[in-house]
Amino acid sequence: MELKTSYASDNYPIIVKHHAINSLERYIKNEEQRFFIIDKQVYNLFVDKLEALAQKFDAKCIVIPSGETSKSFEHYHRTIEYLLSHQLTRQTCIVAIGGGATGDFAGFIAATLLRGVSFVQVPTTILAHDSSVGGKVGINSEHGKNLIGAFYRPKAVIYDLDFLETLPYSEILSGYAEVYKHALLNGEKSTKNIESNFTSNKVLQALKNLDYYLFEGIKTKLNIVVEDEKEKGKRKFLNLGHTFGHAIEYEHKIPHGHAVMIGILYQFIVANHLFETNYNIQHYINYMKKLKYPLSIIKQLHFEDTYHFMLLDKKNDYNGIQMVLLKNLGKPVVTHVDKDTLLSAFEELQSYFK
């Protein structure tokens, strides 16, 4: 499966299939220098394959720590100085091979190196089906997640489904949260469809029909970001579950998608408090439990600590915290939420887990 973005210019292909890595050559063969920035776990799992690929294209491998730990200013500084020591020209290509954090980090390197060099995304996780598309790149600050960054489009996104076959279940759960989020944004039909396909942890672990839902998720995201690349309006809808999710992810260092799924649950409760919605919260809790999401951390949360990190969210303005909420499935809105409502919803969330 393949599709292409539809911006006014500078469009790029998104290739989703098994053995997609074979398409890499056409996007990097004309560059003078090539660097593969690779997630450590991915490198260890596919070392022979990746070293052979690097040798084929005369590329240097830079292996970085797995996950969010790589997205520090210190690691950025060390990596960019290493790259600059190679007397680079702008005919340099950075290839990100890893999950969402690797793509964020390598993309920010590419965006800032010599004011911008070529960049190819090779996502290796389910989670990265979301982050690799749309052009957001960046690193973290001590004040919060993704607060230092840029909008920078890749030359191509090459999504080789072969990489997904080695994912541990925790990573599958993390990625599925974003796939599920896209279904919620699409509406009731898409939500019922995905829930009826992934009915248990065993079905999800088998990745049944996953390629279809990944492709649908990518299309959903593209339909939004092509209209609003710089997140001035409707692109904010893609942050469904992320205001609360990012806060607990950053505070408790849990996997991104695990936190987002809890954030999705929380926004349903907030929506019930603010709007005339009547979401069946227990239904969503039961569904998450069927898939074996680790929800016990909800009991450990403290409102004031979580609220502090919610205040750092990039969607906020001088009027306070803004959240993406679903007025109905498929009908997202961005709205301010006062502290009292947030606290009341927080207390209700915890009440389900006593």
Curated annotation (Swiss-Prot):
Major place of residence: cytoplasm
PANTHER family, alphabetized: 3-DEHYDROQUINATE SYNTHASE, 3-DEHYDROQUINATE SYNTHASE, CHLOROPLASTIC
Protein's recorded name: 3-dehydroquinate synthase
Entry similarity comment: Belongs to the sugar phosphate cyclases superfamily. Dehydroquinate synthase family.
Keyword Lyase: yes
GO CC, alphabetical: cytoplasm
GO biological process: amino acid biosynthetic process; aromatic amino acid family biosynthetic process; chorismate biosynthetic process
Amino-acid positions noted as binding NAD(+) in the UniProt annotation, renumbered to this chain: 66-71, 100-104, 124-125, 136, 145, 163-166
Domain of life of the organism encoding this protein: Bacteria
A single MF term (Gene Ontology): metal ion binding
Subcellular localization(s) per the UniProt record: Cytoplasm
Cofactors that this protein relies on: NAD(+); Co(2+); Zn(2+)
E.C. number: 4.2.3.4
Pathway info: Metabolic intermediate biosynthesis; chorismate biosynthesis; chorismate from D-erythrose 4-phosphate and phosphoenolpyruvate: step 2/7
